Amino acid sequence: MKVYFSGSIRGGEPDRGWFKRLIRRISRHGEVLTENSFGYSPEEETGFDDAWIYERDMDWLREADALVAEVSAPSLGVGYEIAKAEQWGTPLLLLYREQPGRRPSAMLNGNKALEMFVFTEEEEALKAVEGFLAQLESRSRDSSSQ
């Protein structure tokens, strides 16, 4: 399985340690296409050509069997990736860390076609990722055996 992981890199306060833990968990189920995108420092990331990043990421997103997006920090890029994945029929799981005085984006939370998992503890989110990917793997096995 190929999974596209999405999270805020330039916007908000990217939690790179949390993203790396998520990526490690996702990688138990297959290839994380965007894994290396989260290994760059913010300075390195802004040094890449934006058109190159866009083309690379859209290629990966087209190739992905699923998208897991961490949406706790607002990000236009993450929202764009979610919209494209939804348009293309790619299964999605959105993760939102509950924060006092803040709410998830109404455009994401109000879209009943999107699965958003709200969590307070990281382990809850990791278990949600496991369940989401295991369900996709099961569907894939079922459809290939028919």
Predicted regions and their residues:
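Conserved catalytic or regulatory cores that recognize and/or transform ribose-phosphate-containing ligands
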Residues: 1-146
